[in-house]
C-alpha cells in the first residue's frame, strides 16, 4: 500500500534536488498566483495547476528536468502526472515548496 501511494504521489527514491537545480532543473510551482505571491522559491515559475494544460507552451523542452511543487505535494503530484501524460520525460514531484526550498 505504501509503495502504491508513493508511486501515485511521485515520491520515490531520495533525489539530490540541489544537484538537479545546479544542473538547470526548472522548478514549476503549481499553486495559485496569490499563494505564489505570498512566498516562493527564487527562480521558480508559477503555473497554477488549474491552467497547466493551457500553459504547456511555457515548458518548451519536453526532455528538461522539471521539479513540481505546491503547498503540500498533492497538486504537484497531479502536475507531475499531467506533464508525464503530455510527454515530459524527466518530471519529479518536489512536494511542498517550503520543504523543497530547504532541500535546495
Predicted regions: what they are:
Residues 67:
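Short active-site loop at a secondary-structure junction
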Residues 2-16, 20-25, 33-64, 74-104:
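Rhodanese-like catalytic fold shared by cysteine-dependent sulfurtransferases
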Residues 70:
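Short cysteine clusters
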Residues 29:
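N-terminal glycine-rich beta->alpha transition that marks the start or flank
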